[in-house]
Amino acid sequence: MQLHNLEYKKGSRNHKEKRVGRGHGSGLGKTSGRGQDGQKARKSGMVRLAFEGGQTPLYRRVPKVGFNNDRFANKYNVVTLISLVKYETKELTVEFMYANKIAKNEDLPIKVIGNAVLPSGTVVSAHKFSKGALESISNSKAKAQILE
């Protein structure tokens, strides 16, 4: 490909600007494609979104509902036991998980979930464990160390 062989993508240069109010012959003269008189024929004539002609709009007729706990929820880096099995170290610390990108956000505490068989003697350190994870760790003769 060379500079003198470059071409525009097909259909990319066909859109012409709509010139309105330039006489009958243009096809968009007189009313400029706005139809006859009425609010929508005026320059600022569109009504706002969800306007229902003075009737109380649906979003005000329907009551507010529910509660979202997002602001108050405790957020965690969730780490599965299956993702920890492939590392052949005896100590799986929080620093190790951050360093190996097992847990992404260093600002959040780590919660270990899931069920997998860890090598016996492994010590897993985290801020929180699910019941299933604690059960799996104790069944595989490993230790769970809960951090503050």
Swiss-Prot record:
Gene3D superfamilies: 3.100.10.10. Residues 11-22 have a biased composition (Basic residues). It comes from the Bacteria. Residues 1-10 have a biased composition (Basic and acidic residues). GO terms for cellular component: cytosolic large ribosomal subunit. Residues 23-36 have a biased composition (Gly residues). HAMAP family: Ribosomal_uL15 (MF_01341). NCBIfam families: rplO_bact. Part of the 50S ribosomal subunit. This is Large ribosomal subunit protein uL15. The lineage of its organism: Bacteria, Bacillati, Mycoplasmatota, Mycoplasmoidales, Mycoplasmoidaceae. The gene is rplO.
